[in-house]
Each structure stands twice: as structure tokens, then as C-alpha cells.
Amino acid sequence: MAEELGMVLTSELNRPSVMEALPSNFNRARFIQNTVALVQSNEDLSRMPQAKLVPALMKGAYLGLDFFNGECYAIPYGQQVQFMPSYKGMVKLAKNFSKRPLTDIYAHVVRDGDEFETGMDGGQEYVRFKPKTFSDAPIIGAFAVAQYVDGGIKVETMSKAQLDAAKRVSKAQSGTAWKFFPEEMYRKVVIRRLCKGIDLNMETVEQARIMQDDDAIEAEVTEVDNPFGD
């Protein structure tokens, strides 16, 4: 299975039309090695027909995302394999393709008792956050920030109610990630919403087509070895 999959991916990646659609810094050998390793470690993926599996894997190649490093997921769903960038992958795409160059993207949860304020000052967004040290108070919301090279920022905020609404529509709402790492999952939700609001200048038509696929972007992970991509 591994050798056959590697050969199929190599053949696909060497097609002239595909080569033109890949990112300029794409590492074919590393992508094939990491992707084959991922499929070998996942029984559900290894059982999928290659006709269903390979198209999902190729979406990661077109975007320059690494499945094995948790930048994107190939998710068995019925008789299909669904592709989805992780929040780590969304951050990478935003940094690589933002029309307005970025220096950093980060997110925090806000707990009861933390000092938090966001607004506009002189036409520029701002955020002020002072968390209580070692606080285990209830989470009341989350925010994410994109910092631009020109000094500006973009802020996304979500209340606890909005975060929980996102959880309810997630296919993973009963999974271990939400149960044991809710803070990380809240950060994931708000970062993904932030990244979707950043204007991207994709290199190829194929990349733009994948990013415009609402199902690919909005779908939630079921059960993946590392749900946070870290």
C-alpha cells in the first residue's frame, strides 16, 4: 500500500499541469514521505480506495500544506475523504498569501476577571489584554490577532456563546479534543474565523478554487491523532 501510494503521488506531482499549480517552494520528496507515513498510521485512510484518497491528498500539495505535521487533515467520512486545513495550516496560508504582509497571528481565551478591551483608535483597531495570573476562572470568550508588517492589526473576537455554537455544529463536539482541551479548541475556532477574513492572493487558480470550497474550509475534524497540529 505505502509503495503503491508513493508511486501514484509521484506520478500525479510530476504531471506538467500539476507542477505548474504547485507552490514555488514545494518539496515533493518531503510531501510524499510525510503523506505516505500519515496514511500508514491511520487505518481508516489506509482502507480508502486511492481514487477517493489521492484527490484529497493533492489538495494539500496544491496549498503547500503538510498532513503529517498537522497543517491539514484527510478525513474519512463515509465513502469519501474530506480535505481540511487545520488552524495551523490556515495561519501558514495567511502568512504566505496575505495581500497585506503579516508578521504574526495569535489567539487567547478570555476568562472571567481578565482585563480585555478592543476597539478603534484613530482609524486603527486595537486590543488590550491583561489576564489574571494563573487564573482558572470560567472562559467568557476568545480573541485572535493578526499583526501586519505596516504596524496595523486585525482583531477577531467571539463570545462564549459564539464559541459554543461553533462547537455544537462540529462533527468533533463529543470527541476527546473538546473534552480534554477546550481552551485549545476555542483558540482554534477564533483563529480560523480570523484567517478566513484575511484577504489572500493565491499563486494559482487551483489554490483559489480549494480555498473557495466552503465545505473544505468549514468542515470540522472528527478524530485525528493530533487535533491541534502542534
Region spans (language model):
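Binding-interface segments
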Residues: 2-201
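Glycine- and charge-rich intrinsically disordered segments
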Residues: 1-19, 202-230
